[in-house]
């Protein structure tokens, strides 16, 4: 994908999906432990989410890092807002905040 196409793809994915996880691998088969952790958390909370595998598209990965100003993956978006990566998602899950954030999300 070209840069403009990547930006359009990213914006559409975030806009169309209440919960989207840009990750390495898929929710069925995460390709890194960090992505797997966030998938497990979302599954424990019973949240339906869209997963986008960034592993095989270097340009998309780099453009997403610039778009989000976040250097690592996974990247969790809820209602169009970047929540963060694995450590933040885990912390929010452990203190109950992630469940509150997701409570009003209708997927």
Swiss-Prot record:
Top-level taxon of origin: Bacteria
Residue numbers binding glutathione: 24, 61, 73, 86-87
Binding site for [2Fe-2S] cluster: 32
Keyword line: 2Fe-2S, Iron, Iron-sulfur, Metal-binding, Redox-active center
Domain Glutaredoxin: residue ranges: 7-107
Residues in the signal sequence: none
Pfam families per the UniProt record, alphabetical: Glutaredoxin
GO MF annotation, one: 2 iron, 2 sulfur cluster binding
Family: Belongs to the glutaredoxin family. Monothiol subfamily.
NCBIfam families found in the cross-reference section: Grx4 family monothiol glutaredoxin
Protein known as: Probable monothiol glutaredoxin 2
Organism from which the protein derives: Rickettsia prowazekii (strain Madrid E)
